[in-house]
């Protein structure tokens, strides 16, 4: 004969404790999410200016001060763009470099970006190259026309020069290679364009605006003294102690995400 099955009722106290743990866990998770969202909102709106000195040959007397702005993605966060323009105006720069992704494919209004461009071009000669997000935007041509009206020099796989304190400085610009390929104009690799620009033959220092940093070796092989890039966002995924975990077009554990990098006589500054 089998033993009788005994079923004891669950303690009401045990059920309440489990329910309380679930509630506390949900509250903690919600708090973490709120704090994370708040930090991201604050981080996207804060303005941090990083000054970096780069040694190159044949620079103008007193050096060459460049304001480098990249990957704003139409960041009209309150007065952020106004503060950015005011900060650059105070810096007594020789030129301004806009290295792409001023807008993205979601941008619906160019007003704040074009106001910024007009302000900057009144401060110093201002140059712009297309990033990948402008290539995907339906407002690309409107943006280019607006930048020209604002006094910005647009460099689409071309170079120009200007004199700064008696020294001729060549400023060249490569638009994002994806834009060029979609337009059916140039190959995906920048080497062919750089061959045509012949920066190594320039009489003075050369500054190359190029949205994507992963082509550093090609930029260096073609005589660029200073390269200004963006695109990598400091690593779109970063981990404490490890640093950048992932960046677009570089993949996992990317090497070129921010700061100054050197190859031969070429210095690249990534924003």
Question: What would you call each of these model-derived segments?
Answer:
Residues 1-58:
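N-terminal membrane-anchoring alpha-helices
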Residues 44, 72-77, 103-107, 182-186, ...:
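Short, flexible loop segments at the rims of nucleotide/cofactor-binding pockets, characterized by
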Residues 45, 50-56, 196-209, 213, ...:
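Extended recognition/assembly regions associated with phosphoester-bond processing machinery
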Residues 53-67, 152-153, 159-173, 203-205, ...:
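Beta-strand-turn-beta hairpins that frame and shape the catalytic cleft
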Residues 62-158:
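Membrane-embedded segments
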Residues 94-95, 127, 152-153, 169, ...:
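Short, Asp-centered acidic motifs that coordinate Mg2+ and/or phosphate
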Residues 145-152, 164-209, 216-217:
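Binuclear metal-dependent hydrolase catalytic cores centered on His/Asp/Glu-rich metal-binding motifs
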Residues 212-271:
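Conserved beta-sheet core of the metallophosphoesterase superfamily
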